[in-house]
Amino acid sequence: MVKDAVVARFCELCQIQNIKLNELATRSGVTPSTVYSMVDATRRDVSIVTIKKLCDGLGITLGEFFSTADFDTLEQEIK
């Protein structure tokens, strides 16, 4: 699932940069509740605008964010 891959990637990047989700929110100019709702499995998908803001907070591009094997191997999600 795409959302799971997005959440896993942000968690990985936070671990690499040694920051917590609260710090990611602060750096990105989004509320902590936005970040925590993203990792909540019962919540809706995260928007590309939010992903862009979080990437900016991490100092990476969208291309760098999505350039992983996890995203390359995702199955189509046509409903």
What are these model-predicted stretches?
Residues 29-45:
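Recognition helix of helix-turn-helix/homeodomain-like DNA-binding domains
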Residues 15, 26, 56:
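Alpha-helical residues within the helix-turn-helix
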Residues 42-56:
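Short, basic-rich loop-to-helix N-cap that marks the start of a DNA-contacting helix
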Residues 13, 27, 38, 68:
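Residues in the recognition helix of alpha-helical DNA-binding motifs
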Residues 37, 66-79:
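Short, charged recognition helix plus adjacent turn
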Residues 1-23:
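A short, Lys/Arg-rich alpha-helix, primarily the initiator
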